[in-house]
Amino acid sequence: MSVAITASAGMQRWVDDAAEFPRAVPARLRMLLDTGLVHEAGGTYLERPSAELLERMPAAELEAFVNRVSLDTLKPVQRLERGSEPWCYEAVAIGIAFGERVLAASAGHVSIVLDLDEERSSCVLRFTSGPWAPPHPDEVDWLGMVRG
């Protein structure tokens, strides 16, 4: 089981900062970092789901994430100005949480892409799922370029 989280150039630094500076991020994401978030091959991978988090993730939130959903459609998430730290960290946290729920249900692999919607000034998460497979070499190369 694994979750691969990749990010656009505009979002990658929030993913990196969340893993590198856990004390600077909200408690919800800090809990995720403490339960198995690691860096591998240019992506961020969660190797095991957190039972506590699975129980706390409402079904309505899961239903909201169909293909492409922006964070401002979720009632529990306070929408902040684009580029503010809590807002972007929350996007990462919700992406990880959603991936955990899919893993628990399917025992497969989930890819989560975080991006910025310039027109709506909101974070966007796109999800795909399927059987586990290592990241494609082209994807890793692309991540290396945007993170450099």
Residue ranges of model-derived segments:
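N-terminal leader/targeting segments
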Residues: 1-74
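Generic serine detector
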Residues: 2, 8, 50, 70, ...
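Long, charged/polar, surface-exposed segments that mediate recognition or autoinhibition
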Residues: 67-99
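Acidic, proline/glycine-rich low-complexity IDRs
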Residues: 90-148
